[in-house]
Swiss-Prot record:
Keywords: ATP-binding, Chaperone, Nucleotide-binding
Native species: Haemophilus influenzae (strain ATCC 51907 / DSM 11121 / KW20 / Rd)
Alphabetized PROSITE patterns for the sequence: HSP70_1, HSP70_2, HSP70_3
GO annotation, cellular component aspect: cytosol
Protein name: Chaperone protein HscA homolog
Family as reported in the entry's similarity comment: Belongs to the heat shock protein 70 family.
Keyword NADP: no
Length: 619
C-alpha cells in the first residue's frame, strides 16, 4: 500500500498522471538528487554530468556559488565559504563554538542564540546555507526532469533531534520545496537495497558519511521495512579522518597552519591523501616545502579509535534490537567514508560477513529517497512497501516526586500516538503543568527537558477525581506534539516540541549508556520516590480529615495519638529508608482506621437524616 496519495480534496489522482518527485540526500560533504524514471531510481546529474554536488556555498561580494565552484573557493576565501553546514544546523552558537573552535568563520548570535555566519553578503544562518544547497539541487532536478517538482523526500541522520529535523524542513521550505517527508538515511538505503536485491531478514545499515555516523538494525519481510533499533554519532565521519591526517602532517613537519587559508589547504591535502589510500598502499603529501609519505598502515592506526567508536555503537544497537550479530544476514555500507578499506575490513570482522557494496555508497541514500518520494506522490499506488522508523530516545512526562513516566519508549515505530490518563494530587486543583522529557532514566533530574505547558480550567474536585488525558504524537518526521485534555470539560492545551538547539553526540551517548550503568540505582531511587509520593498523599488526606472532623469524632488522646504517628511519618519521609517509610504509612493507616470508619458512619447518618425508608427505596 502507498503511505500517502496526494490529490485535491474530493478529487482522485488522474490514473496515468505522473508527478515529478525527487529524493534528496542532503549530506555533510556532498549532496545528491535522484528520481524514479521508467520504473528505476536514478541519480540526476548536473549540467557537467556530475552526480555529487559538494555541500558548500561561497558568498562572494558580487555573487553566490554553490557546489564545486564554491568548493574551489574554500582555500582562497575560507571565511566566506561555508562547508559541512550540516554539522551546524539546529545547534546553538555556544555549542558550535565549543565543538568546532577551529572553523574559520566569524559567528554572531541570533536573537534566540543560534549561530549566524558573517559573510560578504551579510549574516547567514545554517538554515539559509542549507536552503541555498537545496535550491541548487532543485534547479538540477527541474532542468533534468523538464518541469516543476510536486514534492521531495529529504534524508537526515537517524540521530537528528527535533530541532535539527525542523531546521532541515525550514531550509527546504525556504528553497520553495514541498517536503513530503524527512526520511532517516539508513532507512532510505535499506529501501534501495530491498527494491534492487530483494533482501529479506535482518539487515544492518552502516552509514559513515563526511560528518555523521549512523547504524540501523532493520527487519525486512514481505515488503515491510521495520527499523528495530538505531544508534549514531552526529560528530563522526570522514571529515574527522581528514583532520587526523592533517594533525599527523603537523606532527611530522613541526609546522602549524598560521592562517585560515593554510588550514584549509592542509585539510584539502589530507582529504586527497585519504582518497589515494583507498586504492594505493601509500600517499605523498607535499605541504609548505615539506613532502611526507603516509602508508595505509599508518592511516589505519590513526583512524582506529574512530572506527572502534563506531563499532561500539553497532554493539549497542544490536543489544537494543535484541539481535545477535550472527543473525544479521547482510550489512549495507552507506556513505563515502565506507570506501576506506580498513572500515570495510573492521565492519566485516565485527558482523562476520562481507559487507554489501553493490550500490554506490555515495548514491544509495538518494536512490532510496527517490523511491519513497515516488510512492508519496502517488505514482506507485500499487506499492506494498511500508517504512517504519523509530523514536531514538524515550519520551515521557514528569509525575509527582520527580519521577518520569515513559509514554513512548525508545525504538517505538513512528509515526505513533500514545495516550495515558493522569489525575490531580490535591483537592480543588484547577491547573496542571505538563513537563515533557526525553531520556532513559527514572528521575526527572537525569533526563532532558523538552518543554513545559500548563493545562488550566480543570473543575475543582477532590484529589484523584479529575481525569486528564495526555497524548504524545510523533509524526513521520520525528517531530513531537503533546496535548493534555480534561475529559469532563474537554478543555485542553498543547505544545509542539521544537527545541532551540539539539543534543550533542556526547549527550545522546551518555543518555543511553547511563540508563544501563545506573539501572539498579535508578530502580531504587524510583521506589523511594514512589514511597515518598504515597506518604505525601496519606499525610495530606489525614491532615484534611483531622481539620474537618477530628475535634468532633476523636477524643483528645485519640487525636494526639494520630498526630504523633503522623509526625513520625513526616519525619521518616525525609530519609532514604524506603522500608521505614512503608512501615510509617502502614502505622498511620492502622492508627486512623477507627477514625475513617467514624467519618464514613457520620457521612451516612448525615445523608439519611430526615428521610424515610420509601425515600431510600425510591430515590
Amino acid at each position: 500500500m502507498a503511505l500517502l496519495q496526494i490529490a485535491e480534496p474530493g478529487q482522485a489522482a488522474a490514473p496515468h498522471q505522473h508527478r515529478l518527485a525527487v529524493g534528496i540526500d542532503l549530506g555533510t560533504t556532498n549532496s545528491l538528487v535522484a528520481s524514479v524514471r521508467s520504473g528505476q531510481s536514478v541519480i540526476l546529474n548536473d549540467e557537467q554530468e556530475r552526480s555529487l554536488v559538494p555541500s558548500v556555498v561561497h558568498y562572494g561580494v558580487e555573487e553566490k556559488k554553490v557546489g564545486l565552484e564554491a568548493f574551489e573557493q574554500a582555500s582562497l576565501d575560507p571565511k566566506n565559504t561555508v562547508i559541512s553546514v550540516k554539522r551546524l544546523i539546529g545547534r546553538s552558537l555556544s555549542d558550535v563554538q565549543s565543538r568546532y573552535s577551529s572553523l574559520p568563520y566569524e559567528f554572531v548570535a541570533s536573537e534566540n542564540g543560534l549561530p549566524l555566519i558573517i559573510t560578504a553578503q551579510g549574516a547567514k544562518s545554517p538554515i539559509e546555507v542549507s536552503s541555498d544547497i537545496l535550491s541548487r539541487l532543485n534547479h538540477i532536478a527541474e532542468q533534468r526532469l523538464g518541469g516543476e517538482l510536486s514534492g521531495v523526500v529529504i534524508t537526515v541522520p537517524a540521530y537528528f533531534d527535533d530541532a535539527q529535523r525542523q531546521s532541515t524542513k525550514d531550509a527546504a521550505r525556504l528553497a520553495g520545496l514541498n517536503v513530503l517527508r524527512l526520511l532517516n538515511e539508513p532507512t532510505a538505503a535499506a529501501l534501495a537495497y530491498g527494491l534492487d536485491s530483494g533482501q529479506e531478514g535482518i539487515i544492518a545499515v552502516y552509514d559513515l558519511g563526511g560528518g555523521t555516523f549512523d547504524i540501523s538494525i532493520l527487519r525486512l519481510s514481505k515488503g515491510i521495512f521495520e527499523v528495530l533499533a538505531t544508534g549514531g554519532d552526529t560528530a563522526l565521519g570522514g571529515d574527522d579522518f581528514d583532520h587526523l591526517i592533517a594533525d599527523w602532517v603537523i606532527e611530522q613537519t613541526k609546522l602549524k597552519p598560521q592562517t585560515a587559508n593554510q588550514q584549509r589547504e592542509l585539510i584539502t591535502l589530507a582529504n586527497q591523501a585519504k582518497i589515494t589510500l583507498t586504492n594505493e598502499k601509500s600517499a605523498v603529501i607535499s605541504w609548505q616545502d615539506f613532502s611526507v609519505e603516509i602508508s595505509r598502515e599508518q592511516f589505519n592506526e590513526l583512524i582506529y579509535p574512530l572506527v572502534k567508536r563506531s563499532l561500539l555503537t553497532c554493539r549497542r544497537a544490536l543489544k537494543d534490537a535484541n539481535v545477535e550479530s550472527e543473525e544479521v544476514q547482510a550489512v549495507v555500507m552507506v556513505g563515502g567514508s565506507t570506501r576506506v578499506p580498513y572500515v570495510r575490513e573492521q565492519v566485516g570482522e565485527f558482523f562476520g560477513k562481507t559487507p554489501l557494496t553493490s550500490i554506490d555508497p555515495d548514491k544509495v541514500v538518494a536512490l532510496g529517497a527517490a523511491i519513497q518520494a515516488d510512492i508519496l506522490v502517488g505514482n506507485k499506488t500499487d506499492s506494498d512497501m511500508l517504512l517504519l522508523d523509530v523514536v531514538p530516545l524515550s519520551l515521557g512526562i514528569e509525575t509527582m516526586g520527580g519521577l518520569v513516566e515513559k509514554i513512548i519508549p525508545r525504538n517505538t515505530t513512528i509515526p505513533v500516538a500514545r495516550a495515558q490518563e493522569f489525575t490531580t494530587f490535591k483537592d480543588g486543583q484547577t491547573a496542571m503543568t505538563v513537563h515533557v522529557l526525553q531520556g532513559e532514566r527514572e528521575l526527572v533530574d537525569d533526563c532532558r527537558s523538552l518543554g513545559r505547558f500548563t493545562l488550566r480550567g480543570i473543575p475543582p474536585m477532590a484529589a484523584g477525581a479529575a481525569h486528564i488525558r495526555v497524548t504524545y504524537q510523533v509524526d513521520a518526521d520525528g517531530l513531537l506534539s503533546v496535548t493534555a485534555m480534561e475529559k469532563s470539560t474537554k478543555v485542553q492545551a498543547s505544545i509542539q516540541i521544537k527545541p532551540s538547539y539539539g543534543l550533542t553526540d556526547e549527550e545522546v551517548t551518555a543518555m543511553i549508556k547511563s540508563s544501563f550503568d545506573n539501572a539498579q540505582e535508578d530502580l531504587q531511587a524510583r521506589e523511594l520516590a514512589e514511597q515518598r509520593v504515597e506518604a505525601d498523599r496519606v499525610i495530606e488526606s489525614v491532615i484534611v480529615a483531622l481539620q474537618a472532623d477530628g475535634a468532633e469524632l476523636l477524643s483528645t488522646d485519640e487525636f494526639h495519638h494520630i498526630e504523633t504517628v503522623l509526625k513520625q511519618l513526616m519525619d521518616v519521609k525525609q530519609g532514604s529508608d524506603r522500608d521505614a517509610i512503608a512501615q510509617g504509612i502502614k502505622a498511620l493507616d492502622t492508627a486512623t482506621q477507627e477514625f475513617a470508619a467514624r467519618r464514613m458512619n457520620a457521612s451516612i447518618n448525615k445523608a439519611l437524616t430526615g428521610k424515610n425508608l420509601s425515600d431510600i427505596e425510591n430515590p
